Amino acid sequence: MEQTLSIIKPDSVGKAHIGEIVSIFEKAGLRIAAMKMVHLSVKEAEGFYAVHKERPFFQELVDFMISGPVVVMVLQGENAVARNRELMGATNPKEAAEGSIRALFGESIGVNAVHGSDSLENAAIEVSYFFAKTEIVNALA
């Protein structure tokens, strides 16, 4: 069974959309293997998004991700990475499929409700960035 990382970003946390977003994941057959709310430090946000360090939007992304608490979770299920990506929708909410999380709750490319791992390899890296192995349960057991 695959695992992937999902982050409910500060905009969605601030607008009390956590329950609605979690419900979308669960109704699609993804289970929560770990979840916590954190307020990222500058160092944590920069480390997590280090792959984008040279991109022009990097500082804006970091500033946004530290602007309020986020909910980080490990989603588990069949094809979890691809299913999560499909549920999230396109990065730009205006291009996201109707009914997708970003179409429902996103405002712009930068303020787009959620983050999700883009590959199995990155999912493993991202999950370990936020969670120790002992914090993750087998949600399908």
UniProtKB/Swiss-Prot annotation:
Active site per UniProt: H115
Chief place where the protein resides: cytoplasm
GO CC annotation terms, alphabetical: cytoplasm
Subcellular localization, as worded in the UniProt entry: Cytoplasm
Stored CDD domains: NDPk_I (cd04413)
Amino-acid positions noted as binding ATP in the UniProt annotation, renumbered to this chain: K9, F57, R85, T91, R102, N112
Matching InterPro entries: NDK-like_dom, NDK-like_dom_sf, Nucleoside_diP_kinase, Nucleoside_diP_kinase_AS
Alphabetized PROSITE patterns for the sequence: NDPK, NDPK_LIKE
Pfam family, one: NDK
Keyword ATP-binding applies: yes
Known catalytic reactions: a 2'-deoxyribonucleoside 5'-diphosphate + ATP = a 2'-deoxyribonucleoside 5'-triphosphate + ADP; a ribonucleoside 5'-diphosphate + ATP = a ribonucleoside 5'-triphosphate + ADP
Keyword Phosphoprotein: yes
EC number per UniProt: 2.7.4.6
Co-factor requirement: Mg(2+)
GO BP of this protein: CTP biosynthetic process; GTP biosynthetic process; UTP biosynthetic process
GO molecular function list: ATP binding; metal ion binding; nucleoside diphosphate kinase activity
Keywords: ATP-binding, Cytoplasm, Kinase, Magnesium, Metal-binding, Nucleotide metabolism, Nucleotide-binding, Phosphoprotein, Transferase
Protein function: Major role in the synthesis of nucleoside triphosphates other than ATP. The ATP gamma phosphate is transferred to the NDP beta phosphate via a ping-pong mechanism, using a phosphorylated active-site intermediate.
NCBIfam families cross-referenced by the UniProt entry: PRK00668.1 (NF001908)
UniProt record similarity statement: Belongs to the NDK family.
HAMAP family, A to Z: NDP_kinase
Assembly mode: Homotetramer.
Annotated protein name in UniProt: Nucleoside diphosphate kinase
Originating species: Chlamydia muridarum (strain MoPn / Nigg)
Gene that specifies this protein: ndk
